[in-house]
Curated annotation (Swiss-Prot):
Transferase as UniProt keyword: no
The family this protein is said to belong to: Belongs to the HflD family.
Main localization (coarse): cytoplasm
Cleaved signal peptide residues: none
Topological category with respect to the lipid bilayer: Peripheral membrane protein
Organism of provenance: Xanthomonas campestris pv. campestris (strain ATCC 33913 / DSM 3586 / NCPPB 528 / LMG 568 / P 25)
Compartment(s): Cytoplasm; Cell inner membrane
Protein's name according to its UniProt entry: High frequency lysogenization protein HflD homolog
InterPro entries on file: HflD, HflD-like_sf
Lineage: Bacteria, Pseudomonadati, Pseudomonadota, Gammaproteobacteria, Lysobacterales
Superkingdom assignment: Bacteria
Cytoplasm as UniProt keyword: yes
Record-linked HAMAP family: HflD_protein
Length: 204
């Protein structure tokens, strides 16, 4: 994979699969450990030059690529997911322009990365709690506010809320990468075919 569109769809897949886990946790209280770990690891790989470097490989965002394929072919089963994704892509614009918030988030990520290294697990509950608190103290105050709906029983649990916020932070990180790779909301109008073809290549 080398074209900018190939890179963009990998980053967009990162957004999609992080948000799918947000939806899953909000509804069921449970997540897929491997997908959560990929999302959290992407937050810590801030110096990676390519999407493959951020996620590990295209295989690690295969769930997100399948979500994109289903969206583009009108087979998506969760109407809330595209709305969440749009909110995150819009939120990314506000975030990167707020230099004070960017600096605070960067320092918080560095601290959480050290904690993950000490604990030996990037998806440890304490790490998720730290990342969730970081999101709550910073990005969650920006607009548009990402509204997560789900089962009130689970959304009332501190651990569930922390994991959701950590995944929202990961989604924003992927949105930043998408924009760095040349992504734009105009792609969905004027480059849809190129996006579909790039997703198909990534899934081969």
């Amino acid at each position: 994979m080398s074209s900018s569109m190939d890179h963009r769809v990998l980053a967009l897949a990162g957004v999609a699969q992080a948000l799918q886990q947000v939806r899953r946790i909000a509804e069921t209280g449970h997540s897929e450990a491997a997908t959560v770990r990929t999302a959290v690891d992407s937050v810590f790989r801030v110096d990676a030059a390519t999407p493959e470097g951020v996620y590990g490989s295209s295989a690690d965002v295969a769930p997100g690529l399948r979500l994109l394929h289903n969206y583009f072919t009108n087979q998506g089963k969760d109407d809330m997911l595209p709305r969440l994704a749009l909110a995150v892509l819009q939120l990314e614009r506000r975030f990167v322009r707020d230099h004070s918030t960017v600096e605070t988030v960067s320092k918080g990520i560095e601290a959480a990365a050290r904690q993950a290294q000490t604990l030996g697990d990037s998806a440890h509950p304490d790490v998720l709690s730290a990342l969730g608190a970081l999101y709550a103290q910073t990005i969650s105050h920006l607009r548009p506010k990402v509204m997560v709906q789900g089962n009130p029983h689970y959304l009332g649990q501190a651990g569930v809320v922390a994991e959701i916020r950590a995944l929202l932070l990961a989604a924003v990180r992927s949105a930043v990468l998408w924009r760095q790779m040349g992504g734009s909301l105009w792609d969905f109008l004027f480059a849809k075919r190129a996006m579909i073809e790039a997703v198909a290549r990534a899934l081969r």
